[in-house]
């Protein structure tokens, strides 16, 4: 559980929001700080992309799917594992979806 702006925000044991509707960009900053990440414009690009992906496909992308979808939209420079791991060192799919307020991707350990 997180306390944010005086409200209790329910999370699972790994810190993923139980209700993605409670997400906001200001809450994302707090979640990112808990992950040891200071959000740059590049981080926001991925976080927003992951949220859009979830809204379109009703699932959080696992790493392979994330890399492929990022490459299709932004090109090979940003759609590759090295770039994404530089931004999200504990796992791009796991950390980006957590910061985006989405459920943990199914294929993430």
Curated annotation (Swiss-Prot):
Q: Which UniProt keywords apply?
A: Cytoplasm, Transferase, tRNA processing
Enzyme class (EC, first level): transferase
Q: Which family does it belong to?
A: Belongs to the DsrC/TusE family.
What subunit structure does UniProt give? Interacts with the TusBCD complex. Interacts with MnmA.
Which NCBIfam families is this protein grouped with? dsrC_tusE_dsvC, PRK11508.1
- The positions flagged as active site in the entry are 108 (cysteine persulfide intermediate)
Q: Which domain of life is it from?
A: Bacteria
Q: Which GO terms describe its cellular component?
A: cytoplasm
Show the Gene3D superfamilies listed in the entry. Answer: 3.30.1420.10, DsrC-like protein, C-terminal domain
Q: So what does this one do?
A: Part of a sulfur-relay system required for 2-thiolation of 5-methylaminomethyl-2-thiouridine (mnm(5)s(2)U) at tRNA wobble positions. Could accept sulfur from TusD.
The protein's location, in the record's own words, is:
Cytoplasm
GO BP terms in the entry: tRNA wobble position uridine thiolation
**EC annotation from Swiss-Prot or TrEMBL:** 2.8.1.-
Q: Which protein, by its recorded name, is this?
A: Sulfurtransferase TusE
Q: Name one GO molecular function term.
A: sulfur carrier activity
């Amino acid at each position: 559980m997180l306390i944010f702006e005086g409200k209790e925000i329910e999370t699972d044991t790994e810190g993923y929001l139980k209700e993605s509707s409670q997400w906001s960009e200001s809450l994302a900053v707090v979640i990112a700080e808990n992950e040891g990440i200071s959000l740059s414009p590049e981080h926001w690009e991925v976080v927003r992309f992951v949220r859009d992906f979830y809204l379109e496909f009703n699932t959080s992308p696992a790493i392979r799917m994330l890399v492929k979808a990022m490459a299709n939209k932004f090109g090979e420079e940003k759609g590759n594992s090295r770039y994404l791991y530089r931004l999200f060192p504990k796992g791009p799919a796991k950390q980006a979806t957590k910061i985006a307020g989405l459920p943990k991707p199914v294929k993430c350990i």
